């Protein structure tokens, strides 16, 4: 080498970290970084190398970015280059913050192409997820022919490397697979200073510039790498940082535990101001302590941040209750993916979303292209090809079960006095049976429509000649027919005095039923049923006091039915309207108000359309 080269090695500055939710602690991290840069300018080093985690978050605030650019500009003024790699905390899917600083001339991003500082070539590898370490590609490193023969080569990485604690990567493996001989490997991610030799290469961690946790009790530092013709030297420089004070107060079971704790705290009054204080309370656990009072007392003594921990052990409980083991996050994700049993498409989507090589703006496009490629590769004509569809947990309903349950039941509701007629059987006759039991006139109740049977059960019941069964729901909506039948059976005050009177009542009932049916005109789109071979007949039931409708013992001739209908011709509908005269045994409908919307035809007809006469009975 022509001359001695000095490079400042730092890492894990974690700028923007608001530790313990304290703005003062956020400023402390910037002050530590400023100290490093100030020392670099004062020592006139040849370059500053940052080994990852410049920021604590991949989304630093605008204030953090402005302060960082302000600090880096001091190096630019001093003509000292700043080189860095991307750490795991700040890694983004697309453009990195180092790329922005490089465009501004404030920094350079290290990679497989070397950055030259005199006769020293510096390479870099960004933080690699643990799951991708076995697949890392060592090819692509550039070794320019213009490099001098005695050129020294440095590699900068952000990984936990073996032989450090909890390693992710074997440093010896990396050095062996590199296409060049590395004189030193400058590392980040481990926050303590380390320096070891692996083979012929030096491996060193500079440590973090500020304490990221209470466990980091050692002084913070950075390193100076000195390269010359005689060899390589690594020296450590510490950084002054805010004091972390650890106090242990023991309670021995007296009545005044607070006095014991405050007495112990008072022994450190000179160290408490502007310090981050950690107080552990140990000893007897019988007394109840208010930690808020202890924190307020320490803050009153000038502490910046106070953390109180109850380290007392309750009687009968061993000190080690549970052993906690922390698993690798990447391994946990892999186990969760195996548990989910994703298909090929799901695995492709997961891989694209979590890949750092796919920019966020191209996730949708890349996912679509990969899935289309998967679909095109599938041979749908393959006889072994099969699409699995989850089976519903709902048990199928057997239509015959409803019918069988009805047939097995010995009791039939009084309202089930109307025999069902299949719409597909025009030759069947609708027969209205006489109720088996009739209540006294004073005990008459309003007849409620039972829950209608389904169409399947309705058809099956007719085919099996079962007991009476209500038709489907469309019959329940027939307001006019239901109202007429209900009011006929409720009219108990009309009692015939003679068979002649009873006969007139039967005729009136027949007329009322015919009047209701005649409302269904061809204009409404209703298809009337053809003439049945077994017409409806009416019989007299003088024992019950009113006329009931029952199946005839003998079928009357059409002439008799015609004579009965002509007897009440004056009560037949004229021009589609009922007569205003009240038929015997039929409630007066003239007093019932009709809604205006019904007159104008704004609402649907009460009688369903396109059903035959059997549906209405």
From Swiss-Prot:
Q: Where is the composition biased (Polar residues)?
A: 529-547
Q: Where does the record place Basic and acidic residues bias?
A: 560-583
- For the ligand (Mn(2+) 1), the binding residues are 12, 14, 53, 191
So which cofactors does this thing need?
A: Mn(2+)
Q: Which domain of life is it from?
A: Archaea
Start-end of Low complexity biased regions: 395-432, 549-559
| UniProt keyword DNA repair, yes or no | yes
Question: Could you tell me which SUPFAM superfamilies the record lists for this protein?
Answer: Metallo-dependent phosphatases (SSF56300)
Activation/inhibition comment = Nuclease activity is regulated by Rad50.
Q: Which GO terms describe its molecular function?
A: 3'-5' exonuclease activity; DNA end binding; endonuclease activity; manganese ion binding; Y-form DNA binding
Q: Which CDD domains match?
A: MPP_Mre11_N (cd00840)
Kindly name one Pfam family recorded for this protein: Metallophos
Provide the active-site residues from the annotation.
89
Family per similarity comment: Belongs to the MRE11/RAD32 family.
Quaternary data: Homodimer. Forms a heterotetramer composed of two Mre11 subunits and two Rad50 subunits.
**Described purpose of this protein according to its UniProt entry:** Part of the Rad50/Mre11 complex, which is involved in the early steps of DNA double-strand break (DSB) repair. The complex may facilitate opening of the processed DNA ends to aid in the recruitment of HerA and NurA. Mre11 binds to DSB ends and has both double-stranded 3'-5' exonuclease activity and single-stranded endonuclease activity.
* Protein name per the record: DNA double-strand break repair protein Mre11
The species this protein belongs to is: Methanosarcina mazei (strain ATCC BAA-159 / DSM 3647 / Goe1 / Go1 / JCM 11833 / OCM 88)
The lineage is: Archaea, Methanobacteriati, Methanobacteriota, Stenosarchaea group, Methanomicrobia
